[in-house]
């Protein structure tokens, strides 16, 4: 007979705590958890209350040593910012977990629950959970302080153009709106010959200068002025100024090129018409339809001026018009415009209809003009031309009249215009009485030139009924397909998430 015995079950033994005598499982310290916590506090040295700075103007928190960051409540960025405030004490323990404890948004308190571990007596690892209270203290950041002190800008971009017309500035304004280059500006100030853009950082101003160089022919100079300095920390506070000069040529200007420049452009005639100003100056020779593009560097190397200003435009009536079929081209001639037609016309001033004085000229508007049409142009015969290049030209090389564009009834065009443009919010120093007429000229240029229209956001005006693309006079109009709807977003699509802590 064999005796069956139950298998021996090995159970861990118990020992008595060396302090209180309570039976416990063996551990390296031979002390119960309660006694160990009473003797050792692993959170010692970690502050339980910390202050954190918050700017209520811009809703940003201060991150040492000198930056301000924007963080939403109970976000990971804000938690990282809070832990950095106690980074040195936390380096002595092992951080296991960290999370926010909910507080009222207006309580100016942030509570963070931390779980830490640390090796204590004889290799025993103790874990502890505690809460750090962050007191939010209001403090105005440096940027907001400068705003309140009216000394908030650090860089300014001064854009200037020495012309009597603002067509280039109106075009530049639309490009700035289209690409959102005005979003970082603190203030935009309009003066009589340009615009000033104020920025809170030099980097934003440099970005604006680069944008201007890509859109219009310019040159610029940079300077800076020392405002304050700290010799102990070796820090300096500068104000930077970027002076940007746009070429003094606008659309519909008649210019006279230097002989050297005209020869380098394909033996063009020196008298040319500016048909467009974008990133380069687009010129056309009204006698041969030869076109040329002049960039900023070429212009400043061989500068030229406008012979007449827009107020000198005179109205002519077309008496006779014929198309030139065979265009003679000299050796080395440049490109010929395919969008224009060369014509020979006889015109007479509308102010001299009681006389029989007529003028003969060649024009690039042969595809638009018919006998009886009204056209705007410059009378170079009876005009006092004070230009060094014109004075050196032979009289037979200077045309009597240079026609610029066909004339339409402006009142009717304004009444039928069913589109509009947006404008920059800016401070106006002086309002010129001629600004409205110049703005209407720019709107007419948009209707007549499709190439410029492509770079501009045009919005449909719902108050004006939609009509055909051309009116009874044949004046060009912008089609509905080229217009955008003017949208107004009145509510925040993201809802209330990430709202500011203080109001």
From Swiss-Prot:
UniProt cross-references to Pfam families, sorted A to Z: NMD3, NMD3_OB, NMD_SH3
N-acetylmethionine carried by residues: 1
Phosphothreonine found at: 433, 470
Keyword Cell membrane: no
Protein keywords: Acetylation, Cytoplasm, Nucleus, Phosphoprotein, Protein transport, Transport
Entry-annotated residues carrying Phosphoserine: 258, 468
Origin superkingdom: Eukaryota
Motif range (Nuclear export signal): 480-489
Subcellular location: Cytoplasm; Nucleus
Motif Nuclear and nucleolar localization signal: chain residues: 405-422
InterPro entries in the cross-refs: Nmd3, Nmd3_N, NMD3_OB, NMD_SH3
Residue ranges, annotated region (Necessary for the nuclear export of the 60S ribosomal subunit): 425-503
CC terms in the record's Gene Ontology section: cytoplasm; nucleus
Any GO BP: ribosomal large subunit export from nucleus
PANTHER family linked: 60S RIBOSOMAL EXPORT PROTEIN NMD3, NONSENSE-MEDIATED MRNA DECAY PROTEIN 3
Role, per record: Acts as an adapter for the XPO1/CRM1-mediated export of the 60S ribosomal subunit.
Family: Belongs to the NMD3 family.
Subunit structure: Found in a 60S ribosomal subunit export complex with RAN and XPO1. Interacts with XPO1. Associates with pre-60S ribosomal particles.
Name listed for the protein in its UniProt record: 60S ribosomal export protein NMD3
Protein encoded by which gene: NMD3
